[in-house]
Structures are given as structure tokens and as C-alpha cells.
Amino acid sequence: MKRKEDRNYLENCKAISLINADAKHASKVIAGRITKVLQEIIHTNQTGYVKGRFTGEAARSIIDVMEYTKQQNIPGILLFIDFEKAFDSIDWNFMLKCLDAFGFGPTLIRWVETFYNDLTSCVLNNGICTSYFELQRGVRQGDPLSPYLFIIAAEILAVTIRSRQDIQGIMIGQEEFKLVQYADDLTLFVPNIECVELILQLLDRFTICSGLKVNHTKTEAMWIGSCRQNTATPLGLRWSKCVKALGIVFTYNDTDQLQKNFYDKLKDIRIQIRLWNCRGLSLFGKVTIIKSLLLPKMLYVFSVLTTPEEFIKQLNTIIYNFLWKGTDKIARKAAVNDLKYGGLNLIDLETYVKSSRLAWLNRIFSGGSSPWKAYIKYLLEDFGGVFLFSCNYDVKDCKVTSTFYRELLQWWADLRITFSTRPSISYNIIWNNKDIKIDNKTIYYSNYIKAGILLINHLQFNKNNIESFNSAKSKGLKHSNFLVWSGVRAAVPAHLKSLDVIESELECPLEFHCGEKKINPIVCKNKHFYELLVSDKAKVSRGFAKLKEDFGLADSAVTKAFLKVKTVSSEMFIRSFQFKILSDITFTNSRLAKIGYVQDDSCTFCRVSPETVNHLFYECTHTNQFWKDFKNFWFALSGKHVELSLQDVMIGKLDEVSGLLNYFLTVAKWHIWTSRKRCLSPDIAAFKEVINMKYKTEKYIAVKNNTQRKFQARWKLFIDS
């Protein structure tokens, strides 16, 4: 497979191994056993191929080290190591010794040896195979076991670097950090050029042991902190002001950072849209393209970087223009809702940005050390570190210089205010409480917390100042005086003194009640936050409300009608058409005349009455005759009479089980619509031809999706006729 670099050079190609099924299954079994212990043996600095770890943590660590060194005005260097053909060059003996070093037993090691002993391969190029040749190094890309073997081998290098006292890292608070990894991508944080020299010497020795060779043409270095204006280029390395790694462009230049991480991707999305606009996609087809191809280009960036509001607006405009080719037909707040409420399940970008940021709470309170965790503790040091998230704070009272983490604090506070249905324990916490201030500033006294004085009732308002102070001192309060104690008690407003306190909630102070549910950010993922946030923003569509009003239906009936869109047909165009009917976004002459697109609003068929949706599909004399013929057609097919009201025609028979009648009704409306566009009256003979054609289409899709049995059951009446 060719990489994005210059295709004229062989080193820019990578091989994907085609492995026989038996070997692949056996390899997968061994891989499954190794993955069970990876979290224990692989340091949290490695974010690649270890379950539960996120690549964005490595990217965020690099950004935070850059910010920290700049704020503290301390020198630093980022070294981005690129290994030449890393997966293809690792030495097998070294790999097996690494497994032994980490305590894997002889049985598992023998299995790995079995996969690599007497290994031969050939190259398939343009359908032509070379003769087989013996392999002597490397792990096969395409083998389930390969990534785990590689990161175990790479961990030996990381352990060596972390243990070397002469190779210094960047100190953030009291913690020293030297590196982050993502599979074979290694980024090092060092304070000076001497450490870079030591690392390069170590890497040369590591090459001899492991076979992994540094690619000096792609390895980059970057001056950071107080050295960021340095223009020197020592040691023959590529020194850059702007480096791309881990899917993110790292630079101190804000303009370049926005352009390369956001607006360049916007150009790619525009190009993709131009290509897909030529394909004549259905509405649901476009939704699929948006969710599976266009937005994934940005979702990772949203989770790692601060996203400008202007960019979100531009991206929304591009996406909705692609979807509707003009003015929105469904309100955006309805479009992001679930199909059962008349929505399209589109991703709400603003909500996704917030949910992906809130998902960092789970990572903050998980185990392990990382530069980004140390950085946020440093930022919140005056407020007790991450303890602040448990408090009833106001972001305005917290001087947090990082926009990324300030937004996290703001959105977490907003989430609790919006969704908490009863006061949480945070309202009772004294410290950093926006309602408890001295000299118009919130308070945080670590010595009080060490003495167990955390909640308002711990200030003992059932006693006077002197009695309560003496009681607190007897329970361990140190390094405080009576005036400070009295000041804290006086700062508590009367309405907070009467709040009910459930001290057991201190076991998980971040948790709050949302109706009958408990929301605990420590276990919540991006998906959970998104569902919660979008539930408050999403609205029921206008089409949903109109169906209720026009036909006097209950919410459950309208929901059922919209959900049947997913099963009415396997063909996206038919599904999309039925959705448009239900959503009242089909443009008949009556609607076109109202917006000034046509002068004559009369029916295309009868030229007498205004062409409303109801008239076109049911009330017109031409359409009415077609439905009579349709009922005869259905009787001949099924032997059953069917009555068709306006509701039945527009939304289908809600109690129909097999789905064939509803499918025929939808295709019949499709036939009426296409006849209108051709200025021809709907005709039962032409409809039968359409059904025969659609039968072939549905059968083809069923074969492709391996759903022939379901297809046969639905179409039995038609097949037997």
C-alpha cells in the first residue's frame, strides 16, 4: 500500500500481509491472551493498541508541555522520533527476549516462535506473484498479534529512557516527564541539546539490539518554551517551527495551528462534497456520507484542540448545504434528533465538541501519570487540583490560563446546573464554592480539608464561634486561628446552612441525580455525555407535530410511523421519499407558488384544485382512480380487500405485519410523484412495471446483505402470484 508521501520512492510503500486463516485464528487467540496484561506491563505513556487508552492523551501531552514551558519561560526541546520501517525491521530474537523480560511463560513464547519460524513470503503486485523468500525480521502488518509484539518491544526502549538519570525530562510541578508514545511514534521532552545527544546515542545502541533504525530524514525536533525563537539547527536534525504528529499539527503560531488543524481539513471536506454531489445521493445516503466520511475527519481534532466557534458555523453551513442543497427543510435542532421524533440522527457539532471535552473527566480520574494530568493539576493548584471539579465553583473565580481546560470546567459546571434535578453534595462543599466568599473571592484552605472540614455542616453551626473552633482543633485542625475560623463561618449564607446533607455522597462527590438516573463522569464516555446534552437541545420535528395534528394521532403512533421508515424498504431512495412525506417536505405546486418559484399552484394532473400534498397523493380525481385500481391489484395479489384512508396512504398501515402492503403503498406514492414530474397521470400498468423493477432491486440488496430469508418472507405473496 502506498503512503501519502512521494510514491516514486519504495520506502513510502508498506506491505500488508495476506495470512492463511488457520495462522490468523491461532495468532488472534495468542493476541487475546497478551492483551489481558498489557495495561499492567505497558506504561501509560504508550497510548497505542492498549485497551482503554486514547491517542489524544499523547497529543494533549505535547500541547500542554508546549504551553507549560512557554508560561514558565523554561527551555525545552521536542524530539519526534521516526523509525524506518519499524514494523518490518524489528529483530525476532530481541522480540522474544522482550516477551521473556516481561514474564510471559515459555508456552506462549513457543507459540510466537511457531508463527515466525521458517517463515516465507512472496510479493503480489498487479496480480503477479514473485517466488517465495525467507523472512528474518519484522512483524507482519495484517497479523492480529503484530501490534502487541511491537509495543512490548518498544516498551523496553521507553523503560530505558525513563530510568536514565542523565537524560532529563521536563518538570511539571513535582513530576518529570520524558516521553509519550503511540505505537512506533515516539515523542521526547528534554530541556537541552545535551540530552538530545544522549538520546541519539542510546537510539544507535538500541538499533544494534532491536533492528529498529531511526529515520533521520523524517525525525524532527522543535525548540519550545524560552527557546522557541531559537533558529539553530544542530546535530543534523530537521528543526521545525511546525510539526505534524499523532494527527495534529503542533506549533506556537496560532494562525498556522488553526489553518493546518481546522481550515485545511475544511478544504478536504469541500472537495469530498463536490465529488459526492455528482452521485445523486438520497437524503439518507447523504446522512451516511456526513456521519461516516465527512465528520470523522474532524472528530478527533475536536476532542484534542480548542475548537473555534466560527469554524463550527462554517462546517455546519457546508454540511447542511450538502444535505439540502439550499435552505434547511428541517430545523437543525430537529435534524439532530432521533428518527422516532422525526429527526435524521445527525451529529450536533457544538454538542459533540462539549461531550468530547467532558469525556476527559473520565481520563482525569483514571490511574496513571501523564504530562497533561500534571499540567491540569498545576493549573488548578490554588483550588486543590482536580478536587475543584467536585465543588460548586464558578469558572470566573478560577484563573485558568488554558482555554482547553477552562472550557472543560465551564461545560462541567453547566452540565450539573442544567441536568441536576436535586442539589448534589457539591453545594455543601465549602471550598471553591461560588456562594461562599471572603473579600469577594472564593476560599480554599488545605489545612481545613486535612482536618476533615469539607462540608458546611462541619463548621458546626449548632455551636457558637468559640465552641465550634475548639471542637475543630480537638479533631485535628492545625495552622489556623480563631479569626480565620470565624471568617469562614460568617461567609456561609443562611440558605446554605439549611441544606440537607447526605455524607455518603462524599464517596463520589462528582455524581449528581438527573431524574431517576445518577450521572457519574468517572464512568461516563463521550457517547453518554452526547446523548444527555443533545436530549436537552434536540426538538421534535415540525412534520412530527403536523402528523399528530392532522390525523389526531398519539405520540406513540407517530413514532411508529417514523420508525417504519427504516424497514419499509432496503432501498435508500424509497426510505428517503417516505421520510420526506412524513416530514411534509415534498415541494408540490402549492408550496412552490408560496415561495414564488412557480406562478400556477394548480394540480399537475387535474389542473383544477391547488396541488397540496393531500390533493396530489389522495384527493385528485386522477390519483383517486389510481388508488381504486391499486385496491383491485392488491385483492388479486392477496385475496383480501383493503380500505385506504388518507392516513393509510400518507403514513401507511401501522398495524401491518409483513411490510409488503406498506412497501407497495410507498412505491405507489413514489410512482405518483415521478408521474407528476413527467406530467403523466399515475397508471396501474406503469405501477406494476415499477414493482417488477423494484422487486429485482430489493432482491439484489437482499443477496448482497445476506438477508434472502427475510426478503422471501416479505415478498411471498408477490413471488407466488
Where are these regions (language model features)?
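Short, conserved catalytic/metal-binding micro-motifs enriched in Asp/Glu and His
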Residues: 14, 82, 99, 112, ...
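Short, conserved micro-motifs composed of acidic
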Residues: 127, 199-200, 214-243
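Basic, alpha-helical interaction scaffolds
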Residues: 236-307, 358-365
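Conserved, non-catalytic sequence blocks in retroelement Pol enzymes and Pol-derived host proteins
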Residues: 17-24, 47-57, 69-72, 84-89, ...
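Catalytic palm active-site di-aspartate
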Residues: 14, 46-48, 62, 76-86, ...
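Short Cys/His-based metal-binding microdomains
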Residues: 593-649
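Extended C-terminal regions of large enzymes
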Residues: 315, 328-586, 668, 676, ...
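Conserved pre-catalytic core of RNA-dependent polymerases
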Residues: 1-156, 160, 582, 642, ...
